[in-house]
Regions:
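Active-site neighborhoods and metal-handling regions in enzymes and metal-associated proteins
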Residues: 1-205
Length: 205
């Protein structure tokens, strides 16, 4: 029986730092939604995010020597999947844009992403994609109760996606986070219940 935290032992203060950091990251995402408009470039948004991270007393994890990414945030537009650095691309109304951000607050890392449509409401297939993937996220979160295996989380996510007739990019997975940006375990978006790594209360993914 695995009795240690797969994502590393953390003090209550470190867990609280992650909660506080997560709130700061969520606020930055709202700031992006309020700020972005057609006519701005991806690099404009990167600079804006960099300034907000500093304003909120955190640091841009991507820009550290550990990661050495050329920007504060990943910005992936339309057919780009994920992890794209900001470019000179100028946003147009209706662009589908994903933002992936990691910040460090009090030495603890928090990592999240969201997708939006520039200057418009999602419609048709794009609306179905965004609403279904969001529901799959919350299905995965709802599967986390007490000791749980990563396969249970993955299976809950996969069911929503399959019911919505969406494909799954199997090479991209969730992961542990906290003491480092990327930590074990991998948390795929597909899987079987009662398989995978056992998580305990105190693990952070």
């Amino acid at each position: 029986v695995q009795d240690r935290l797969i994502t590393g032992e953390k003090t209550p203060e470190q867990i609280q730092a992650m909660r506080d950091g997560g709130k700061k990251l969520a606020q930055i995402f709202q700031d992006i939604r309020d700020y972005i408009h057609a006519g701005m470039s991806e690099k404009d948004i990167d600079a804006f995010v960099d300034s907000k991270i500093k304003e909120y007393g955190a640091s841009a994890t991507y820009k550290t020597d550990e990661v050495n990414f050329p920007g504060a945030i990943c910005i992936s537009t339309n057919d780009e999947i994920v992890h794209s650095p900001a470019s000179d691309y100028i946003f147009q109304k209706g662009d589908v844009v994903s933002f992936d951000l990691v910040i460090t607050y009090k030495d603890m890392k928090v990592d999240s992403a969201f997708t939006m449509v520039v200057d418009d409401k999602p419609k048709g297939a794009v609306k179905h994609l965004l609403t279904t993937t969001e529901r799959s996220l919350y299905a995965g979160i709802d599967a986390i109760k007490g000791d749980v295996r990563t396969g249970n989380i993955a299976a809950a996510i996969e069911k929503v996606l399959k019911d919505g007739k969406l494909g799954i990019i199997r090479e991209l997975v969730g992961h542990g986070v906290g003491l480092k940006m990327h930590m074990p375990p991998d948390v795929p978006n597909y899987g079987r219940k009662h398989t995978g790594v056992l998580l305990h209360p105190g693990d952070t993914i």
